[in-house]
């Protein structure tokens, strides 16, 4: 199995359905023995430029370990979900479990 980092930008009006959507994606990954090493909900953030006349989006980060078939199924689901504005899938050499820079920044702002 390979390691991947997945970043999703989700339509801000879909925040209520976010949990159901993410549990569906988790199910796809874990269905064939895949693992989620890190999950971060970055919340609603300002976009650098408007996408579909929107200025904000809900950001989510996954670091997963799964087979290629599961990844293709996940990407197919993401592709045809209108609530997903953008998606980025990056192949990684090993599992990443420590908090991302975005989460560290959020923790500093809270303190």
Swiss-Prot record:
The keyword Ribosomal protein applies. Keywords: Ribonucleoprotein, Ribosomal protein, RNA-binding, rRNA-binding. Pfam families: Ribosomal_S6. One of its GO terms (molecular function) is structural constituent of ribosome. It comes from the Bacteria. GO terms for biological process: translation. GO terms for cellular component: cytosolic small ribosomal subunit. Belongs to the bacterial ribosomal protein bS6 family. PANTHER family: MITOCHONDRIAL 28S RIBOSOMAL PROTEIN S6 (PTHR21011), SMALL RIBOSOMAL SUBUNIT PROTEIN BS6M (PTHR21011:SF1). Binds together with bS18 to 16S ribosomal RNA. This is Small ribosomal subunit protein bS6. It comes from Francisella philomiragia subsp. philomiragia (strain ATCC 25017 / CCUG 19701 / FSC 153 / O#319-036).
């Amino acid at each position: 199995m390979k390691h991947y980092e997945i970043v999703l930008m989700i339509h801000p009006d879909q925040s209520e359905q976010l949990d159901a959507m993410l549990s569906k994606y988790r199910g796809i990954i874990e269905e064939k023995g895949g693992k989620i090493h890190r999950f971060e909900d970055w919340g609603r953030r300002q976009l650098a430029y408007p996408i579909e006349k929107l200025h904000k989006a809900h950001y989510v980060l996954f670091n997963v370990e799964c087979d290629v078939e599961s990844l293709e199924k996940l990407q197919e689901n993401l592709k045809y979900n209108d609530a997903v504005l953008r998606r980025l899938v990056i192949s990684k050499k090993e599992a990443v479990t420590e908090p991302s820079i975005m989460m560290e920044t959020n923790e500093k702002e809270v303190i």
